[in-house]
Swiss-Prot record:
This is Uroporphyrinogen decarboxylase. SUPFAM superfamilies: UROD/MetE-like (SSF51726). Pathway: Porphyrin-containing compound metabolism; protoporphyrin-IX biosynthesis; coproporphyrinogen-III from 5-aminolevulinate: step 4/4. NCBIfam families: hemE.
Length: 344
């Protein structure tokens, strides 16, 4: 029996106190993160400098004692390794060169040619597997093919993923080839993370909610199923957390369809609904406090936290936010969150 509570929850154990970690727990809300990022010079340099990436991963563990650390990286490192240019515009977010044709898909690097660029990420994993406290679970991650493809097609983030939908609907063959290429590369990327020490992998599909009907099945469910099945074939017993953000009704049965051990849910659905329809006493659920409470704090944070814990108490549960913690969050509110959960 492991003493790592997150691994126990992922195996379906119902724990008296849910284990906790937060998406983007290593981030700009922490002064120590801002100092380390300044030392790195820019965001991508931080991702590609193993000592500094490991340091920012460890900072929230030291400060709060979270039950898991998640590798500090970015979902767009993979398309960069596939050969696209990636840069960050101040105040604007990521920008990339684009893939908008079958010719562009064929021009991507092969799955075995991505590792030189990603070698610093694997080195970060090795450092963390040595330095993390023995009770802390180490989570690796990647973006899911649909979400990664939306950036590769548009060259930037967008609210409606219009460019990706247009490509999908006008050149299905090229779009499907792109999804397949990203799927294959994602498996190789995650495999190297696990070989370097990650104990769990999380699949982030941040824009899954924009896929409807059969498209959701084809481009959110199916890639998650393929990736999960192959990762479990290569690494028997490896737990997988899937996060099809804003899937709504699509959360129902997602674990069963994909083989994921846990479904992470956002805060657009209520904890009670998710407990009844997704968790059902047996499926591990991760989530789903509204990140805005990390900004506002106070008694409202305490009550909302207790509500999430109470909703999921009869099944396996990992406490997290419904989305990443924001730069405006107050570090003291995270302390209050942890005290509220741990006191029960």
């Amino acid at each position: 029996m492991t003493d790592k509570t997150i691994l126990r929850a992922l195996k379906g154990e119902v724990l008296p106190t849910p284990p906790v970690w937060l998406m983007r727990q290593a981030g700009r809300y922490l002064p120590e993160y801002r100092a380390t990022r300044a030392q790195a010079g820019d965001f991508l340099s931080l991702c590609y400098t193993p000592d500094l990436a490991a340091e920012v991963t460890l900072q929230p563990i030291r400060r709060y004692g979270f039950d898991a650390a998640i590798l500090f990286a970015d979902i767009l490192l993979l398309p960069q390794a596939l050969g696209l240019d990636l840069w960050f515009e101040t105040g604007e977010g990521p920008r990339m060169s684009t893939v908008t044709s079958m010719e562009g898909v064929k021009g991507l690097k092969g799955k075995d040619d991505i590792h030189d660029k990603l070698a610093p990420v694997y080195e970060t994993c090795k450092i963390l597997s040595r330095e993390l406290p023995k009770e802390t679970t180490f989570i690796g991650f990647a973006g899911m093919p649909w979400t990664v493809a939306t950036y590769m097609i548009a060259g930037r983030g967008s609210k409606d993923q219009a460019a990706a939908h247009k490509f999908k609907d006008t050149d299905r063959a090229a779009f499907s080839a792109l999804i397949d290429a990203v799927t294959v590369a994602t498996i190789e990327y995650l495999s190297k993370q696990v070989e370097a020490g990650c104990e769990v992998v999380k699949l982030f599909d941040s824009w899954a909610g924009s896929l409807k009907g059969q498209d959701f099945e084809d481009f959110a469910v199916e890639p998650a199923r393929v990736i999960t099945a192959e990762m479990k074939r290569r690494f028997p017993g490896l737990p997988v957390i899937a996060f099809p953000r804003e899937a709504g009704q699509g959360y129902i049965g997602f674990a069963e369809k994909t083989g994921a051990d846990c479904v992470a849910i956002d805060n657009s659905v209520s904890p009670d609904w998710a407990a009844e329809n997704v968790q059902k006493g047996k499926t591990c659920v991760q989530g789903n406090l509204d990140p805005s409470y990390m900004v506002t704090g106070g008694q409202e944070l305490v009550e909302a936290t207790k509500k999430v814990v109470a909703a999921f108490k009869n099944g396996p549960h990992i406490f997290n936010l419904g989305h990443g913690i924001t730069p405006e969050a107050n570090p003291d509110n995270v302390t209050l969150l942890m005290e509220t959960i741990r006191k029960g």
